[in-house]
């Protein structure tokens, strides 16, 4: 089974709003709605939304949106939630959904603040992931100004690791290929890697991108599929 996890637990401090970032509306619908729909239309049978900051408000926004479209029953059958009580990083957020992930199949991981992500983009990456038999497939982008994004670091063999902005050296910060925050994982590989992620970094957080290097050391990973993150 193909599943999806939507990261929607953060406050979104750069929005300068008390509302959770993912419930801010684009064309009359909360941003997180578009991530859920992209995952659904790309073939994900079940979706787990990770909530944290004002969790009830996020859940209500999602339910109200689908109810207004006459799709409340479909939403209830497809969408579930996992609570991240403390904001300890994206790796910790995904780990909060361990029961949902399970050990079989693949799981797509998306951010809840990417309203322009399309099912076509996800389908292309999913096909690559399955055709190549990858433990994880990373969607990346080339940006003229990569400031603030995690960098895709390569060696002579290809992808080596992903380094967050605050942990990057001056040389690594000059890299223009960035992590979009969108991935497809084999479920068992993801759970194994999450158990090994540490928080010895500038933020003191458990980073989901750290699973890439762990999986890379164990099984095959493809070159990142490039895509511009919103």
Sequence positions of predicted segments:
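N-terminal nucleotide-binding beta1-loop-alpha1 segment
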Residues: 1-17
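Structural beta-sheet core signal
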Residues: 4-6, 49, 109, 136-139
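A short, conserved beta-strand element in the Rossmann-like catalytic core
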Residues: 14, 115-116
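Short glycine-enriched, charge-decorated loop/helix-capping segments at active-site entrances
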Residues: 19-25, 197-200
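Conserved N-terminal catalytic core of the sugar/cofactor nucleotidyltransferase
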Residues: 30-110, 116-121, 127, 131
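Conserved core of the sugar-phosphate nucleotidyltransferase
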Residues: 117-202
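A short, conserved alpha-helix in the catalytic core of glycosyltransferases
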Residues: 204-217
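Single conserved hydrophobic/aromatic residue that forms the stacking wall/gate
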Residues: 219-230
